[in-house]
Design a protein with these regions (language model features):
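A structural signal for beta-strand boundary/capping segments at domain termini and interdomain linkers
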Residues: 27-30, 120-122
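Short strand-edge motifs at loop-to-beta-strand transitions and within beta-strands
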Residues: 1-3, 94-98
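Surface-exposed, short loops/turns at beta-strand junctions within beta-sandwich domains
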Residues: 6-13, 99-106
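Flexible, low-complexity linkers/stalks enriched in Thr/Pro that connect modular domains
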Residues: 22, 31-42, 125-134
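Short, solvent-exposed loop/linker segments at the N-terminal edge
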Residues: 51-58, 144-150
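Extracellular acidic loop/turn motifs
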Residues: 67-76, 159-160
Length: 160
């Protein structure tokens, strides 16, 4: 048998109660079934690292928080570049963290939070590791020689 509610049901838990009786007035014990409606993916916020971070360090810790009011628990995976997504432990408060080792150049960190209903939220961060020191190409002083107490200009050309 099917039932269509007269109006859309809100996200959350719902219970359907069933009563049955026959023409002779014999009533069955009431039965019920509970279910959840979940149309909203979990929230996901990343507190560290910031997007487009440029650093000279290869060690970084991804930290964040997730929550889903309807379909707990929420699972979190973190993927670095083209590696495998790894499950991360999520605390009772929704907080999580994972240490990563970045490579020189551009790194893509993908964090996915997925609730028990299969809804997911994805946040991506790009972190650039720059370990190349700048190069001083030239230094000029004008005028040269410099007179004491006079104004002079020092020009420096640097590449990075």
């Amino acid at each position: 048998c099917t039932y269509t509610p007269g109006s859309a049901l809100a996200d959350g838990s719902h219970t359907v109660k069933i009563d049955a009786s026959d023409f002779d007035g014999n009533a069955a014990a009431q039965k019920s079934v509970s279910f959840k409606i979940d149309t909203v993916p979990p929230t996901l916020s990343i507190s560290s690292p910031s997007d487009r971070l440029i650093t000279n360090k290869t060690a970084i810790t991804v930290t964040g928080k997730t929550n889903d009011a309807t379909s707990s628990p929420v699972t979190v995976t973190i993927k670095l570049n083209s590696g495998n997504a790894e499950a991360v432990e999520v605390g009772a408060d929704g907080a999580f963290s994972k240490a990563l080792t970045l490579v020189a150049g551009s790194n893509t960190i993908t964090v996915v939070a997925k609730d028990a209903a299969g809804k997911s939220t994805t946040v991506t961060r790009t972190v650039i590791v720059d370990q190349t020191a700048p190069v001083i190409k030239s230094i000029t002083i004008n005028p040269n020689p410099v007179d004491a107490g006079k104004t002079y200009v020092i020009c420096v050309e640097v590449t990075d």
